């Protein structure tokens, strides 16, 4: 298997071929500044985005149209990154050709008092996109396990239960 960081993406190849984590992957060996599948600069990236941006609106329209015939599919995009990593900018740029009415974007910050009254996935389930919608999560349900473990907000036994639920 080719290292995904070094692999170049062929135009007919799915992006997952360079982004999927494979057995033996070591996070510490991954360069956080890398751009798997795209080795051009910012201007070239903006051109590439402009070229495929109209497709996003078309696919969104198809997804919504499917619901008129009873379709239940939705799309969830999960962005995970450090604070100020550009997750919001990605959403603005990539979704610029989509209909905002069909986008449900959620940024998961520290849980509110109401959210703490429920199980740790309650707020995630509430934010899932409905049929025909595209959901974008700024951070994921994994963070609710990671942060609570690192900062010792919940007992170790609860962390083990949460791992079992999300895996």
Which sequence ranges carry the predicted segments?
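Glycine-rich phosphate-binding loop of ATP-dependent small-molecule kinases
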Residues: 1-167
């Amino acid at each position: 298997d080719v290292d995904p960081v070094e692999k170049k993406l062929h135009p007919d190849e799915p992006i997952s071929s360079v982004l999927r984590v494979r057995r033996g992957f070591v996070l510490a060996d991954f360069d956080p500044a890398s751009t798997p599948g795209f080795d051009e600069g910012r201007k070239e990236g903006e051109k590439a985005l402009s070229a495929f941006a109209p497709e996003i609106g078309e696919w969104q329209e198809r997804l919504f149209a499917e619901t008129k015939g009873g379709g239940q599919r939705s799309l969830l995009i999960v962005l995970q990154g450090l604070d100020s990593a550009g997750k919001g900018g990605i959403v603005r740029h990539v979704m610029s050709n989509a209909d905002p009415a069909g986008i449900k974007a959620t940024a998961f910050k520290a849980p509110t008092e109401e959210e703490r009254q429920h199980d740790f996935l309650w707020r995630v389930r509430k934010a899932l996109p409905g049929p025909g919608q595209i959901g974008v999560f700024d951070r994921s349900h994994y963070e609710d396990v990671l942060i609570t473990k690192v900062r010792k907000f919940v007992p170790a036994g609860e962390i083990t239960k949460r791992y079992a639920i999300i895996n």
